Amino acid sequence: MSRLKQPIFLKKIKKVINTIPRLEEQIFACRNKKRSDNPLLFIDRKDEERILMSLYFMENESSSPHSILCFIYWRYTKKIYRLSEDIVSDVANTYVDNIPAQILKELPSWSIYVSAENLHTILPTSYPIHGFFFYPFLNGGGGIIQLFIIDNLKQSQGTTGLKEKNIDVVGGIIGMEDSRGGLLGSRKMECIDNEVVVTVNEKLKDFRDREFNLLNAQISMVLYICSQINDIKEKNQFKRSEKHKKHVHTHHELPAHNIREWDVGIRMGQAIRQYRQQNPQDRATHRCKRPHIRRDTGIHTDRSKKPKLAHERKPRLIWLPPVPVNLEDVNKLPVVITPIDK
């Protein structure tokens, strides 16, 4: 974790927030201080509804209410998460679909910013980005109903600024395939000589495909951050009671003044890199077994010693053969599955 200079996009989001005067002061003034001084741990849903209604009555079409909420919550913590190149190369090309949205409640905060500078070395996109904001929107019952991603665009081909996109969550499931509806816009149906002919705009289709691949990579990176929450979550601050000399845990957290950057998956990336160096593989074949990394649980340790913390446990490289999922023919399932420790 290091102290960084204030990024350029801070000016962009400040301009967006200022579309409603004194909005940031109002939302934090309305929180329930009896439960927590940290609005990221508890904030009344009515505050969000009031923001949405305020924008609705103001007929402000230039700024999305969800973008404003995302920026307000992010400015409270000012954390940037960066994945190592090895992790990005493995995670970004993983196709995700039908993922339970419940896992997103493991996010370090309500709104996060993920640096994606290395994303384009392996995934050409329709527009280059520096990174992206991620904000899950909840309903009154606490269920996630939409995911909002705001890309921080690079200066390229006259395009710059912030671009918002969203994914609907239906029945608590993130359906990535459902978001590909825009691909239909690249197809045109015509009736020629009593026959239906389908023509495809290849340029538009290529744009839609690359846009979807970027979205898939971003969701994969966010899911990886959720899976590594034990490594990146900050410890709760505590104060010592003078009377009983015991630790009293609190959830109080003051707004961050400086940008803080978190390296996610650095140890995992080092383990993958070391494995690849020790096991050089031929790019034209698939003989080399792909490692699957799991952190040692620390269960089988000396009970007389204090258990190791998550960041103290060494990663274990284990190769697991691919397991088919949801096959109709059970006879096609592998007979023997044996993990091989490396």
Swiss-Prot record:
Cited CDD domains: AcrVA2-like
Name of the featured protein: Protein FinQ
Role noted for this protein: Transcriptional inhibitor of the F plasmid transfer genes. FinQ may regulate a gene or genes encoded on the IncI plasmids, and coincidentally may inhibit F transfer when coresident.
Annotated DNA-binding residue span(s): 208-227
GO molecular function: DNA binding
Keywords carried by this UniProt record: DNA-binding, Plasmid, Repressor, Transcription, Transcription regulation
